[in-house]
């Protein structure tokens, strides 16, 4: 990782510092992938549960209440080890609100350490598995690296594809082409 404050935006701030500390500890203990799996399991629970999101976001709960509630949830979900201790620590330190950002930053650090580039791809409708593999292969050729594909379905695109990798973006959607034609026709008047 780059030093002297040149980390990416996800590794900046409180979330980035916590994620980096967790990554370094997990790396030292040979548990990087186990921690990632457990954080992903917690993140899935977070996205599915309105009650958990309220607990995480609300300052009305004390650190002790958050720690106890999160501890019970982790036990029920089978999330243990370093990831569970980390989540409990964020609750005890009143940083639970930043946990979703910490999880994103941890994922980014894991990808970076493995030389994997995240590509956000938006399409109008769900492509077949073969098309998804073709997209990955094309992006791998361009990036000269393994790709972690984050696929989003966006019917407003009408057709085509929008790809974002790092700071680069290619918009080959039908919506953008139609808007360009519309703009050209207005200028021709």
Swiss-Prot record:
The organism's place on the tree of life at top rank: Bacteria
A GO cellular component annotation in the UniProt record: plasma membrane
Disulphide-bridged cysteine pairs: none
GO molecular function, one term: proton-transporting ATP synthase activity, rotational mechanism
Topological type in the membrane: Peripheral membrane protein
Keyword line: ATP synthesis, Cell inner membrane, Cell membrane, CF(1), Hydrogen ion transport, Ion transport, Membrane, Transport
InterPro entries reported in the protein's UniProt record: ATP_synth_OSCP/delta_N_sf, ATPase_OSCP/d_CS, ATPase_OSCP/dsu
Cellular compartments annotated: Cell inner membrane
Main localization category: membrane
Subunit structure of this chain's protein: F-type ATPases have 2 components, F(1) - the catalytic core - and F(0) - the membrane proton channel. F(1) has five subunits: alpha(3), beta(3), gamma(1), delta(1), epsilon(1). F(0) has three main subunits: a(1), b(2) and c(10-14). The alpha and beta chains form an alternating ring which encloses part of the gamma chain. F(1) is attached to F(0) by a central stalk formed by the gamma and epsilon chains, while a peripheral stalk is formed by the delta and b chains.
Biological role stated in the UniProt entry: F(1)F(0) ATP synthase produces ATP from ADP in the presence of a proton or sodium gradient. F-type ATPases consist of two structural domains, F(1) containing the extramembraneous catalytic core and F(0) containing the membrane proton channel, linked together by a central stalk and a peripheral stalk. During catalysis, ATP synthesis in the catalytic domain of F(1) is coupled via a rotary mechanism of the central stalk subunits to proton translocation. This protein is part of the stalk that links CF(0) to CF(1). It either transmits conformational changes from CF(0) to CF(1) or is implicated in proton conduction.
Protein family: Belongs to the ATPase delta chain family.
Name under which the protein is recorded: ATP synthase subunit delta
GN (gene name): atpH
